[in-house]
Amino acid sequence: MVDANCASIKGNKMKSIKVKLSGSSALLMHSDRFANPLDPLTKAHKELTGKRKKTDDDHIAIARSEFIGGCYWNEDTGFFIPAQNLDSCLIAAAKLQKLGVKFKQGVQVLEDELPIDGFKSVTPEKLWENPKNVDARGVKVGMAKIMRYRPIFRNWSLSATVMVNEDVVNLNEVKKALVDAGKLIGLGDYRPRFGRFDVEFA
């Protein structure tokens, strides 16, 4: 579908486009939670990794902690993608049309959090128990290669409202950027191999 249902915002030339994104490749999640040294989960994770001699149980606990720390999740929303991630995805796609600056000025996702459909009642701890939702892969850290554990959603979708200032950019350019973002850019970690999506305009 390519026709957008655009609602005018009274008093200016802002319009909203409601879209549904459906994954065409798996979504690999990796939040920046561990970047906060004051987060209790960060402190607990450092205690686990700080042990000099680690047992198999220690390695499992570290993997689980890393997985949970990589989740974008809260009790109110469930699992979600931050709206700023979709903003960045759209700007990257807009640069293909040489419209990156205009999109920064005139296009923004309305919501703060974009819930992943079907995971509202699932906690990170529960998700960890399903091997289909656990991605384990080797990554390079300096000269060493270590295993990283992240949440993966193999079938996923989410909805968003994209606000457009028509004084800056037109709707057709935004719709093209949305489609390009899904096919060429993607969301989440290891994009565009992961996180690609199809766009449906409501």
For each predicted feature, which ranges?
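RNA-interacting cores
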Residues: 1-202
